[in-house]
Amino acid sequence: MFLALREIVTARGRFFLIGGVVALITLLLVMLSGLTQGLSKQNTSALEALGEQTPYVTFSTEDPSFTESEIFAEDVPASGIPLGTSQTKLEGHGGVAVFGLPEGTQIPGSSTVIPEEGMVLSQSIDDALNAPSRGTLGGVDLDVNAVVEDEYYSHSPVVWVSTATWQKVSHSPEDMVGVAV
């Protein structure tokens, strides 16, 4: 112990240099963990907001693929709520994630429900477009029914629509009600 204290006193510069490097590495790790948490939150916050129920998906082919998944009305259990997701463009804004839920389903974190026709925008989209009353989502003209708190999916703000509207926007068959996520 005496030798260590004597070394610190005689070689102060080296001691502070090594201590500074350790402190900077610690700071780097803290900042990187915060960055990765933020990125992961923006990737899946809309899915996490839907609830804590664990989804179970069974694929019927040998090569399962989430991107090519299709869930039809007869595949949804009585207690299940089908969720359709897709990525498309909202005219004047750019890329958005579209979440299709059955009409009347409550949007997470809000008292707003999914309208029969039209769309519900995330706050950041509404701010960027200066509160529009209509918009073209994936080539389909829709009214803006409400604005809710921001949720994100795949780093894109979410637009909430009914299953029927989601089918039009994502160009899906009429009997397809969702995808595996």
Stretch-by-stretch model annotation:
Residues 1-29, 40:
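N-terminal Sec/SRP start-transfer signal
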Residues 10, 24, 81-83, 121:
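Single, functionally critical "micro-switch" positions that shape active/binding sites
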Residues 26-97:
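Hydrophobic, regular-secondary-structure patches
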Residues 52, 87-181:
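Basic-flanked hydrophobic alpha-helices used for secretion and membrane insertion
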Residues 21-24, 55-56, 172-174:
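A short alpha-helix capping/helix-coil boundary motif
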